[in-house]
């Protein structure tokens, strides 16, 4: 089921404690563009189908990445793309956006998403891995 634009941004805004909808939208656009570069095939399409159309298009037409970024490098890349951001604020942005995307995706799809990402992304999505299970 697709989440509506306003509901998605309202959740990101609340979780990120942003003062304006524009701040929440900026974070969502950057984080999902970077995430899209790490997902392929049906998993990316399935996640996009659960997002508002504007954000789905960003996920489906991502920034290019030569190789998958570790979670730490993902945070640094996010900070570089958001004007005035630090790694600390970027981590906050990532958590607000990816936890909202994870809620929209549901557990089964999130498991597939995390299988395509380097280890450690589970915490960025707010879904710590179960010990003994990948990722």
Task: List each model region and its residues.
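The feature marks the first
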Residues: 1-38, 95, 99
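Residue-level detector of well-ordered alpha-helical segments, enriched
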Residues: 4, 23, 27, 31, ...
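A domain-level signal for the structural core that forms small-molecule/cofactor-binding pockets
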Residues: 17, 29, 87-90, 94-95, ...
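Residues at alpha-helix boundaries and the short loops/turns that link adjacent helices
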Residues: 18, 22, 38-42, 84, ...
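Extended intrinsically disordered, low-complexity coil regions enriched in Ser, Thr, Gly, Ala
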Residues: 37-70, 105-135
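Short, solvent-exposed interaction modules
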Residues: 57-108
